[in-house]
């Protein structure tokens, strides 16, 4: 994929989360999934749970409990690497609680039925254990830096560290999730590792506020520019143009030039309300209770909001930085805050005019270097509804004017003072021209839209391949209902208890019922709570090994829904005698009879 993208001048940037992991990852392994898969490394949770159980039940010291834990896991599971146990804080004196403040108990593994020991979860979510920051820095935690960032940060040859491995496979950089929650020291070393392989590898941090400290050359190249989002949307919703320009100017003055021109200028993302819905009054609020009633659709979105999206897109494609379009915005996708903002792409259902607008703006930006790398000079006027700036380089000088009101506006600008000396200007969007005689120009700026003026003699022919845009709006490309994946909603077992004699086997796969019946991915996996009593293979074959009880947990691969079957194993019953239904039998020649 990466090679194919490179052939068409596209690049892949990998999304990286470096301060927390999934609770079912190999690093933490809360559900004991990796103990039996042959790996020589143990996750943090099984290890510390064993240690704390031993301390409590055997009344021994932590040191002795750790010694016994390593002896046990090495002997039983072949574990030789205990590095991940140092990456997390698991607490012996706290347990996880549910919403009712009741203790959460382990349902699988060695501790089935026992309370889950507490640990720090990202923003309180126990599904995402936090990497420990030793002395305030993840970089100083155990082997984390070596495994994640690399053994030799200056080597031009990639190692198997997380950071360098994926770059060596064709990735062109990293987007760092919740970047402000990781130490500066960690990112400084991370940068060395990334840039050692290729100085063009990009590093983009998720920062929602002023990011100047991250952009001084020792951490990131760019950030997700949420401050641009704030300025652009506030203006589009009727805010004073001066306030928007002041916000943008503060960024330009504070950020290093190299970073300023590389800003990831977004107006929405997977963490916000979608642009069109935000313009229609649905704010960022993951806890909103009225979403069922306010469920946004394109049809019930106001015409004003739809028109304002054209204005926001114009600012994105004409201002300094990298215009970043959240998938589907160009089609008119709607959505409230996370998770509603992550709906599936609406292929073939988008607004044709909007799709073509985004494509045209992209083509214009590609055609004029001034809009990509040219200088930026704000144009302040007396009309708070008109926002303007000049983009210029050695090739062109361009005046961008925008109007956030519901009515067209006639605007007069002294272009000579801005360095534009042409006698006639033209709008590169529409091709309409206007006189600049006397150094001033009067132009009509359309409602909720704008113009891009430049010397008429410098106007370039900009074309868009509309045929390639059809998947966005042509119903022929609409995904048919039968092609959509049907998500699993649950799993149950026809029999929740079975009894087996020692040495016998039974298959429980026929008892598994995945809902709904037409789910796309009905695959499940099996796990036993005690393999010494009853083991289970990937096909659901249960083998009774010793007298006792064990719980077989069935988990769907789609959605991770679970159901349980209790297995009771009894001693093998020895036959005391054999009895036949007949003790005497008379048969005619050629006849048969089956004894029972």
What are these model-derived regions, one by one?
Residues 19-121, 217-225, 340, 344:
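Aromatic- and acidic-residue-enriched segments that line the glycan-binding/catalytic groove
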Residues 260-301:
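Active-site clefts of carbohydrate-active enzymes
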Residues 478-596:
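Extracytoplasmic soluble-region selector
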Residues 436-482:
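C-terminal beta-strand-rich structural cap/linker in extracellular carbohydrate-active enzymes
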Residues 20, 51-76, 158-164, 171-266, ...:
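Active-site-proximal helices and loops of the catalytic beta/alpha 8
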């Amino acid at each position: 994929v990466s090679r194919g993208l490179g052939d068409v001048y596209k690049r892949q940037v990998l999304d990286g989360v470096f301060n927390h992991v999934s609770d079912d990852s190999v690093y933490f392994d809360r559900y004991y999934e990796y103990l039996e898969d042959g790996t020589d490394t143990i996750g943090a949770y099984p290890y510390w749970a064993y240690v704390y159980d031993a301390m409590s039940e055997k009344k021994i010291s932590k040191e002795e409990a750790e010694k016994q834990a390593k002896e046990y896991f090495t002997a039983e599971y072949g574990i030789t690497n205990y590095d991940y146990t140092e990456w997390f804080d698991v607490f012996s004196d706290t347990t996880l609680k549910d919403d009712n403040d009741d203790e959460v108990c382990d349902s699988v593994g060695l501790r089935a039925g026992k309370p889950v020991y507490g640990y720090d979860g990202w923003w309180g979510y126990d599904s995402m254990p936090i990497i420990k920051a030793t002395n305030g820095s993840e970089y100083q935690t155990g082997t984390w830096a070596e495994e994640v960032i690399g053994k030799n940060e200056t080597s031009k040859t990639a190692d198997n560290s997380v950071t360098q491995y994926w770059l060596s496979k064709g990735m062109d950089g990293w987007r760092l999730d919740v970047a402000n929650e990781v130490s500066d020291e960690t990112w400084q070393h991370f940068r060395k590792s990334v840039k050692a392989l290729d100085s063009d590898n990009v590093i983009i941090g998720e920062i929602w506020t002023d990011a100047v400290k991250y952009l001084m050359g020792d951490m990131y190249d760019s950030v997700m520019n949420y401050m641009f989002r704030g300025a652009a949307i506030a203006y589009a919703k009727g805010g004073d143009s001066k306030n928007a320009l002041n916000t943008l100017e503060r960024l330009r003055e504070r950020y290093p030039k190299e970073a300023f021109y590389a800003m990831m200028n977004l107006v929405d993302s997977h963490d916000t309300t979608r642009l069109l819905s935000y313009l229609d009054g649905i704010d960022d609020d993951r806890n909103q209770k009225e979403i069922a009633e306010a469920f946004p659709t394109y049809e019930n979105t106001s015409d004003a909001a739809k028109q304002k999206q054209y204005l926001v897109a114009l600012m994105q494609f004409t201002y300094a930085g990298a215009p970043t379009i959240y998938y589907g915005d160009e089609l008119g996708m709607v959505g409230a805050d996370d998770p509603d903002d992550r709906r599936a792409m609406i292929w073939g259902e988008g607004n044709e005019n909007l799709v073509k607008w985004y494509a045209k703006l992209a083509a214009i930006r590609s055609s004029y270097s001034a809009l990509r790398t040219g200088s930026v000079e704000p144009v302040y006027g007396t009309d708070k509804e008109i926002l303007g700036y000049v983009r210029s380089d050695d090739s062109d000088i361009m005046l961008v004017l925008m109007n956030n009101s519901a009515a067209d506006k006639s605007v007069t600008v002294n272009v000579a003072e801005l360095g534009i000396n042409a006698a006639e200007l033209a709008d590169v969007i529409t091709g309409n021209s206007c006189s600049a005689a006397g150094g001033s120009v009067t132009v009509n700026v359309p409602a909720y839209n704008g113009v891009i003026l430049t010397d008429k003699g410098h106007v370039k022919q900009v074309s868009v391949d509309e045929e390639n845009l059809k998947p966005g709006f042509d119903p022929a490309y609409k995904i048919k209902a039968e092609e959509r994946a049907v998500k699993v909603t649950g799993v149950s077992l026809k029999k929740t208890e079975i009894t087996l004699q020692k040495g016998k086997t039974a298959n429980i796969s026929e008892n598994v019922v995945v809902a709904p019946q037409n789910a796309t991915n009905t695959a499940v996996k099996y796990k036993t709570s005690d393999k010494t009593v009853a083991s289970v293979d990937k096909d659901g074959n249960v083998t009774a090994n010793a007298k006792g009880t064990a719980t077989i947990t069935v988990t769907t691969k789609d959605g991770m829904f679970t159901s349980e079957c209790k297995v009771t194993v009894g001693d093998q019953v020895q036959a005391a005698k054999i009895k036949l239904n007949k003790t005497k039998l008379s048969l005619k020649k050629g006849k048969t009879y089956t004894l029972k």
